[in-house]
């Protein structure tokens, strides 16, 4: 009787801990089934399709609502909790990891697309174009990226990004003159010369969307400053720490609604698709991208994690399952950030000082899946146009795709803009980006999932590499001096050591019934 009862308790505990994940998986299956059935057996109007997807829209709005307070509070508390030298080392390790994995993803994508050659058997005229090509200048896009790092108005940066647009400067009109043969010739010569040397001016404007890059730069500096202010800055640290905890409580509430929202989100997207024939025409191209994403997420990232951390990477990935599934459904690294935090800290027990610093930066600049996709797409478009790319052009694609994906978050309409930048860098027709837009919505979901997985593995790797610095901070902290159990846990039995341990996962876990070990402190 004891074993069945124990198994029953284990099942109850499993369901209690994973009910959101299980219900989300069920919602995905049910959403796909509902979408296919509604599409086949009912003829919904455009307005009815919009109403049908309304619950999914509410989920997206709730997740986007929580992005801003989450990024601000987590970045400030994460940086303030670290010594400036330690935060510099952690930041450097994170950036090196992001750059290396992104470059590996680009190289993998190029190797696959050159080997499989998905565009050789097709021609440009065989594929229908969708959407329009944005007018992009590589230089202006890079300068806009730097401008957005330093917003002129912090409040405006919460909902708008700065962008520039080129406008042609019209020449002054010539005075009226008699159109003799000589004057006519002079006017035509002047007009031709003016067409050859057009003048442009830069016009600044704002587009809707959170300037995440600018906010991260500000929060990074702000966190460093209040961390150095000592007692004067402690009140601000406590405020943002409380804001971070309150935000995560709201995330838990949103997660309860997530299965219902995802059901209608995925069903509504299936109903919206009008031309499924395009998936057959671009099937080999899609298979190339998905193969690259699968290899990168199942082989390369886990291998890097195992080499550095020496732990089972797939167990770590399973702990991130809810975040990966959310990324797959909503197609946004930033909107998935609340769930990513929760999975990394609660399921995988990653130090909060690492997650609060590394994850917001990773969601902004670590785009492994996007970089791989852009590299494959650029070579695919070259193959469609019967263009043979040389070694120099392939290297250019690698460098441009890596750089463009890192700066994607600071560029308005990032997906199309960065794709056009990569195409323009090697002289490919930018308008051909419209050939692959029709399937981009589906591929975007998978590459977002890879981006989030890369961010998650990054926290585990950076935590391992920063273990010595974090332990030194623990030993030198005031709580460890006040609490003798923190330094003498070896003399306690397992039960007491778990109770008396002073610092666990970036937070202070103490026994409030013990007057010796209990100390009022803020948690980071």
From Swiss-Prot:
Residues that, per the record, bind Na(+) 1: 98, 101-102, 362, 366, 368, 451, 455
Its domain of life reads Eukaryota
Primary site of residence:
membrane
Its localization reads: Cell membrane; Apical cell membrane; Synapse, Synaptosome; Early endosome membrane
- Reported tissue expression: Expressed in all tissues tested including liver, muscle, testis, ovary, retinoblastoma cell line, neurons and brain (in which there was dense expression in substantia nigra, red nucleus, hippocampus and in cerebral cortical layers).
Question: Which reaction(s) are listed as its catalytic activity?
Answer: K(+)(in) + L-glutamate(out) + 3 Na(+)(out) + H(+)(out) = K(+)(out) + L-glutamate(in) + 3 Na(+)(in) + H(+)(in); K(+)(in) + L-aspartate(out) + 3 Na(+)(out) + H(+)(out) = K(+)(out) + L-aspartate(in) + 3 Na(+)(in) + H(+)(in); D-aspartate(out) + K(+)(in) + 3 Na(+)(out) + H(+)(out) = D-aspartate(in) + K(+)(out) + 3 Na(+)(in) + H(+)(in); K(+)(in) + L-cysteine(out) + 3 Na(+)(out) + H(+)(out) = K(+)(out) + L-cysteine(in) + 3 Na(+)(in) + H(+)(in)
- Listed binding positions for Na(+) 2 are 364, 405-406, 408
Where exactly are the transmembrane stretches of this chain? 19-38, 62-82, 94-114, 206-229, 239-266, 287-308, 354-380, 441-462
Any GO MF annotation of the entry: glutamate:sodium symporter activity
User: Which annotated residues bind L-aspartate?
Assistant: 331, 333, 370, 411, 447-448, 451
One CC-aspect GO term: glial cell projection
Extracellular topological segments: 39-61, 115-205, 267-286, 381-393, 428-440
Q: How does it sit in the membrane?
A: Multi-pass membrane protein
Q: Name one GO biological process term.
A: blood vessel morphogenesis
Glycan attachment points: 43, 178, 195
Output the PTM entry.
Glycosylated.
Task: Provide the function of this protein.
Answer: Sodium-dependent, high-affinity amino acid transporter that mediates the uptake of L-glutamate and also L-aspartate and D-aspartate. Can also transport L-cysteine. Functions as a symporter that transports one amino acid molecule together with two or three Na(+) ions and one proton, in parallel with the counter-transport of one K(+) ion. Mediates Cl(-) flux that is not coupled to amino acid transport; this avoids the accumulation of negative charges due to aspartate and Na(+) symport. Plays an important role in L-glutamate and L-aspartate reabsorption in renal tubuli.
Q: How does it assemble?
A: Homotrimer. Interacts with ARL6IP5. Interacts with RTN2 (via N-terminus); the interaction promotes cell surface expression of SLC1A1. Interacts with SORCS2; this interaction is important for normal expression at the cell membrane.
Q: What is this protein called?
A: Excitatory amino acid transporter 3
- Gene source species: Homo sapiens (Human)
Its lineage opens with: Eukaryota, Metazoa, Chordata, Craniata, Vertebrata
